[in-house]
């Protein structure tokens, strides 16, 4: 069965351009021209991926994305946001709303197709060999792939697909600085020239879930000019850190 993609964009020229190229690449494409219709179609069809313009009539893309993430029927569908704005704050707001990746208009068709393939691969909407199947653990952190969960100081933390992949990437290289280009290639599946803000927003989300004080991270550290490093205490040191977290209920 062909992967199904829902494209939501009020620009009819862009909508047709995207749809034609996706169909030529073997995808089943459905279309909507405003946020309300797009959200309704997403719930009805439960597509494999949603391409969502941010500046939509009736209901904007930010709101649509938030609603999709709150609905259990659509919460796990990868969302590729489309924006003509290209400003950092708009990208940040899109990621905060729950988008997985973004394309700034105008974009090259090949770049669009590459990002679509990467999102589908990463969420197992099409087969790939890189799926994590084994539990990974060090010190207070254990990652459980089948449920996209982390056990963190004996507490269960639910992660999005992206958060899980990002944390897995850092945990595999525990104690090492991981460059942004390496993170993008492994987690997002592509290697753009400059996409640091994408990583920064998702690192912030991880810190909110794992750090006792996200503004002063103790475990997920920024190595300025070089990348990010996950530093975890060994088993023998856990008692020195456990008091930062409330007792599990």
UniProtKB/Swiss-Prot annotation:
Disruption phenotype: Loss of circadian control of gene expression; KaiA and SasA protein levels are unaffected, KaiC is constitutively phosphorylated. No growth after 24 days in a light/dark regime. Loss of circadian gene regulation, cells arrest growth in a dawn-like state. Severely attenuated growth after 5-7 days in a light/dark regime, glycogen degradation rate is normal for 2 hours in dark, terminates at a higher than wild-type level. Negatively regulated by LabA, mainly during the dark. GO terms for molecular function: phosphorelay response regulator activity; transcription cis-regulatory region binding. Residues 133-232 bind DNA. GO terms for cellular component: cytosol; protein-DNA complex. Pfam families: Response_reg, Trans_reg_C. It is found in: Cytoplasm. SUPFAM superfamilies: C-terminal effector domain of the bipartite response regulators, CheY-like. Changing residue 53 to A: Loss of promoter activation in vitro. SMART domains: REC, Trans_reg_C. Phosphorylated by SasA; phosphorylation is maximal when KaiC phosphorylation is active during the circadian cycle. Dephosphorylated by CikA. CikA and SasA cooperation generates RpaA activity oscillation that is distinct from that generated by CikA or SasA alone and offset from the rhythm of KaiC phosphorylation. Keywords: Activator, Biological rhythms, Cell cycle, Cell division, Cytoplasm, DNA-binding, Phosphoprotein, Repressor, Transcription, Transcription regulation, Two-component regulatory system. One of its GO terms (biological process) is circadian rhythm. Residues 4-120 form the Response regulatory domain. Response regulator of 2 two-component regulatory systems SasA/RpaA and CikA/RpaA involved in genome-wide circadian gene expression. The histidine kinases have opposing effects modulated by the clock oscillator proteins; SasA phosphorylates RpaA (stimulated by fully phosphorylated KaiC) while CikA dephosphorylates phospho-RpaA (stimulated by the phospho-Ser-431-KaiC-KaiB complex). A very robust clock is reconstituted with KaiA, KaiB, KaiC, SasA, CikA and RpaA; output is measured by transcription from an appropriate reporter. Interacts with SasA and CikA. This is DNA-binding dual master transcriptional regulator RpaA. It comes from Synechococcus elongatus (strain ATCC 33912 / PCC 7942 / FACHB-805) (Anacystis nidulans R2). The gene is rpaA.
């Amino acid at each position: 069965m062909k992967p199904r993609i829902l494209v939501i964009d009020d620009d009819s020229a862009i909508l047709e351009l995207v749809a034609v190229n996706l169909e030529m690449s073997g995808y089943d494409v459905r279309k909507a021209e405003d946020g309300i219709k797009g959200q309704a179609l997403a719930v009805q069809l439960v597509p494999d991926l949603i391409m969502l313009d941010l500046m939509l009539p009736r209901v904007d893309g930010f709101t649509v994305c938030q609603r999709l993430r709150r609905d259990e029927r659509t919460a796990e569908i990868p969302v590729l946001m489309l924006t003509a704005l290209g400003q950092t704050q708009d990208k940040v707001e899109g990621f905060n709303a729950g988008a997985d990746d973004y394309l700034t208009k105008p974009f090259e068709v090949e770049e669009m197709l590459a990002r679509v393939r990467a999102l589908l691969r990463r969420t197992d909407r099409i087969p790939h060999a890189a799926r994590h199947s084994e539990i990974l653990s060090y010190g207070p952190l254990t990652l459980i792939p089948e449920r996209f969960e982390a056990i963190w100081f004996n507490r269960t933390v639910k992660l999005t697909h992206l958060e899980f992949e990002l944390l897995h990437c850092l945990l595999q290289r525990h104690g090492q600085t991981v460059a942004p280009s390496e993170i993008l290639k492994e987690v997002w599946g592509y290697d753009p020239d400059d996409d640091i803000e994408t990583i920064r927003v998702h690192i912030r989300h991880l810190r909110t879930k794992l750090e006792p004080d996200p503004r002063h991270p103790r475990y997920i550290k920024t190595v300025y000019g070089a990348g990010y490093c996950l530093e975890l205490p060994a088993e023998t040191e856990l008692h020195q850190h456990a008091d930062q977290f409330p007792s599990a209920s």
